[in-house]
């Protein structure tokens, strides 16, 4: 569960960064 949360958070951060760029 924790791993999934971290993965999801990391994915969201990547998406946010992509949008920011």
From Swiss-Prot:
Record's protein name: Chlorophyllase type 2
GO BP field: chlorophyll catabolic process
Function, in words: Catalyzes the hydrolysis of ester bond in chlorophyll to yield chlorophyllide and phytol.
Pathway(s) served: Porphyrin-containing compound metabolism; chlorophyll degradation
Known catalytic reactions: a chlorophyll + H2O = a chlorophyllide + phytol + H(+)
Top EC class for this record: hydrolase
pH dependence: Optimum pH is 6.6-8.6 for chlorophyll a hydrolysis, and 6.6-7.6 for chlorophyll b hydrolysis.
Keywords annotated in UniProt: Chlorophyll catabolism, Hydrolase
GO MF term set: chlorophyllase activity
Similarity comment: family membership: Belongs to the AB hydrolase superfamily. Lipase family.
EC number: 3.1.1.14
Organism placement in taxonomy: Eukaryota, Viridiplantae, Streptophyta, Embryophyta, Tracheophyta
């Amino acid at each position: 569960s924790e791993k999934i949360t971290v993965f999801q958070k990391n994915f969201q951060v990547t998406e946010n960064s992509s949008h920011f760029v």
